[in-house]
């Protein structure tokens, strides 16, 4: 049985006050909740504060980050390395998010290098994939997802996916209020798992595949009722302790 993972991507949001209030509230909301891994990815400047607040709350929350470099040190202004992230206890690292791919011109191949470097450093990639609205309307969703995943498989082998998390995020559903139906999301998740299974069934069976794209407390149970949806990568709703905890509780309930 795959253990669900619900992760909050805070993106470029936060202040010291907000981080303290959010994590304190989340620690309280998650009291007694079992059967789900709950992670947060604050902006880099707040990872230190988040680490301390998570520890004060009894380490019920996993600390993550929103990006990494493909070097551990050197003349790379503005970047942060896996070694630095580990130093602050961050383990679940988002890579390949559509906003990074679009605004920072990150290619499939570059994202694959990040994936491999995280694994090499003992960290867990949260590997984002997904299609644009135009690609969706053209019926290219499965092909786009396969291309993005194959950038890792072709370079490092299907076994590289062991212990990783794949986050399917249809780009047209991120921050728009639109969302794929639970049935449509399940169809894509099943196709992703089948594509991996064609290369290695054991790897496909254990890999966590999250859904992301306007996941809210109101629709979370419908997603988690699907057999191939193993959690969620949550944006806006993760900035509210009650809403984010409700999504985590839905995962624990539906995957029990």
Swiss-Prot record:
Substrate binds at residues 9-11, 175, 214, 235-236. One of its GO terms (cellular component) is cytosol. It is found in: Cytoplasm. Disulfide bonds: none annotated. The active site is at residues 97, 169. It catalyses: D-glyceraldehyde 3-phosphate = dihydroxyacetone phosphate. It comes from the Bacteria. Its main location: cytoplasm. Pathway: Carbohydrate biosynthesis; gluconeogenesis; Carbohydrate degradation; glycolysis; D-glyceraldehyde 3-phosphate from glycerone phosphate: step 1/1. It is an enzyme of class 5 (isomerase). Homodimer. Involved in the gluconeogenesis. Catalyzes stereospecifically the conversion of dihydroxyacetone phosphate (DHAP) to D-glyceraldehyde-3-phosphate (G3P). This is Triosephosphate isomerase.
């Amino acid at each position: 049985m795959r253990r669900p993972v619900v992760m909050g991507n805070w993106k470029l949001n936060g202040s010291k006050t907000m981080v303290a209030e959010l994590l304190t509230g989340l620690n309280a909301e998650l009291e007694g909740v079992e059967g789900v891994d709950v992670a947060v990815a604050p902006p880099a400047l707040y990872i230190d504060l988040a680490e301390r607040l998570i520890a004060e709350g009894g380490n019920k929350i996993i600390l993550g980050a929103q990006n990494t470099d493909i070097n551990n040190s050197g003349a790379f202004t503005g970047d942060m390395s896996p070694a630095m992230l580990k130093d602050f206890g961050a383990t679940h690292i988002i890579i390949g998010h559509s906003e990074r791919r679009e605004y920072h011109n990150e290619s499939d191949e570059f994202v694959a290098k990040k994936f491999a470097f995280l694994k090499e450093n003992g960290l867990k990639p949260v590997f984002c994939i997904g299609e644009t609205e135009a690609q969706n309307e053209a019926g290219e969703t499965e092909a786009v997802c396969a291309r993005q995943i194959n950038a890792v498989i072709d370079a490092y082998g299907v076994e590289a996916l062991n212990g990783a998390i794949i986050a399917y995020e249809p780009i047209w559903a991120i921050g728009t209020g639109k969302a794929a139906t639970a049935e449509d999301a399940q169809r894509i998740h099943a196709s992703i798992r089948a594509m991996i299974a064609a290369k290695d069934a054991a790897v496909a069976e254990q890999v966590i595949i999250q859904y992301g794209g306007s996941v809210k407390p109101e629709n979370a149970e419908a997603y988690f009722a699907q057999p191939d949806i193993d959690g969620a990568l949550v944006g806006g709703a993760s900035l509210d302790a009650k809403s984010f905890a409700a999504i985590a509780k839905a995962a624990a309930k539906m995957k029990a």
